Regions:
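Acidic, metal-coordinating catalytic cores used for nucleic-acid/nucleotide bond scission
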Residues: 96-108
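Conserved substrate/cofactor phosphate-moiety recognition/catalytic segment
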Residues: 42-91
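Small-molecule kinase domains that catalyze NTP-dependent phosphoryl transfer to phosphate-bearing small molecules
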Residues: 141-220
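Conserved glycine(s) of the Walker
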Residues: 39
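Hydrophobic anchor at the beta1->P-loop junction of P-loop NTPases
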Residues: 32
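The conserved Walker
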Residues: 36
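Conserved phosphate-donor/acceptor-positioning beta-strand/loop module used by diverse small-molecule
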Residues: 115-135
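N-terminal pre-Walker A segment at the start of P-loop NTPase domains
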Residues: 1-21
Length: 220
């Protein structure tokens, strides 16, 4: 159960959402599985626009919690509270947080059942050099830029370091190590029925694939 302060965070987030009417016959709860730097937030925004949905960002909620000196332990519950209201208002919901964890997927499945919605999982991958390049060249979002790290530098550089640390920490959830021929990471098989696996290395390619996927969702 959320505390009064956490409910205020959910209210604050929901108030700034631009609710749009869903473009699918049945409500959709869409979630992504992919490492930091794979493009989850960018692709999620594109998908939300194409299916008539709202984007719910776990990192944005964490920033609100941090500003109010609140712990992160109920981020999922806050996200779900916002999602239920968005679906009830006629929108689809797209989450940009990594859903590789079984517990998180079970919660998403339960949310979809309660809302009589379809839950859809999309896997994102990218060439490692492109992933690292995005992190180094881009501006980290406020959550990473404000996160704690012993690395002393300007906020932007600190944010990049934290995001790289997060990629390193989460890699075993997505890849397994093959020691043959000097060693390489191989994509791990997960017990998930994916609607699609999309390589975001090339922008035009993933944008085309997301548009095709959205068209499928709208027809279903």
């Amino acid at each position: 159960m959320l505390t009064a302060k956490e409910l205020n965070i959910a209210d604050e987030y929901f108030k700034v959402l631009k609710i749009v009417r869903r473009r699918t016959a049945r409500p959709v709860v869409a979630a992504f599985i992919g490492l930091a730097g794979s493009g989850k937030s960018t692709v999620a925004r594109r998908l939300a626009r194409e299916i008539g949905g709202v984007l719910i960002s776990g990192d944005a909620i964490r920033v609100l919690l941090r500003k109010n000196n609140l712990p992160y332990k109920n981020v999922r519950a806050i996200s779900e509270n916002i999602a239920r209201r968005a679906i009830a208002s006629g929108a689809n919901v797209v989450f940009d947080s990594d859903a590789a964890d079984l517990v998180k997927r079970k919660r998403l499945d339960a949310l979809a059942r309660q809302a009589q919605a379809r839950v859809l999982y999309i896997r994102l991958v990218a060439e490692p050099d492109v992933t690292f390049g995005r992190m180094i060249a881009g501006a980290p979002d406020p959550f990473f830029a404000g996160a704690s790290t012993p690395w002393r530098a300007a906020p932007r550089e600190r944010g990049v370091v934290v995001k790289l640390r997060e990629l390193w920490r989460r890699t075993p959830h997505h890849y397994q190590w093959n020691s043959k021929q000097g060693g390489r990471w191989e994509l791990k098989k997960l017990p998930v029925k994916f609607s699609a696996t999309i390589d975001t290395t090339d922008t035009k390619t993933w944008q085309r694939q997301i548009s095709q996927l959205a068209k499928r969702f709208r027809r279903a």
